[in-house]
């Protein structure tokens, strides 16, 4: 079973993502922001990090950069969830080391489809 760290400061979004992923057979650990996610990632291995972009304390790009600085996370896929679909956001995500991104709102089936491609 693949393990996913789901990061979002919105409780309702976190619950929806977690519910969707658990129903698809994934093991899910939730984090409320980038700092919380980084703390959890240091003590447990994940097959994928799924993070919101706009969060207090440490946003998705900051979390991605911080994770990529450590050898343990260099190959871990990181998907960013964002309301921004601009080329600038995509470039910033790539520069930070993100594997990909999904624009909110998104279809839960599309989320599963993207994750299945990434964690093969």
Place the predicted regions along the sequence by residue.
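Conserved acidic segment of CheY-like receiver
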Residues: 2-12, 17-21, 49
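Active-site residues of response regulator receiver
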Residues: 52, 82
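Short hydrophobic/Thr-rich beta-strand motif most characteristic of the beta2 strand and flanking loop
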Residues: 25-32, 40
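Receiver (REC) domain active-site loop signature in two-component systems and cognate sites
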Residues: 55
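C-terminal output helix
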Residues: 106-115
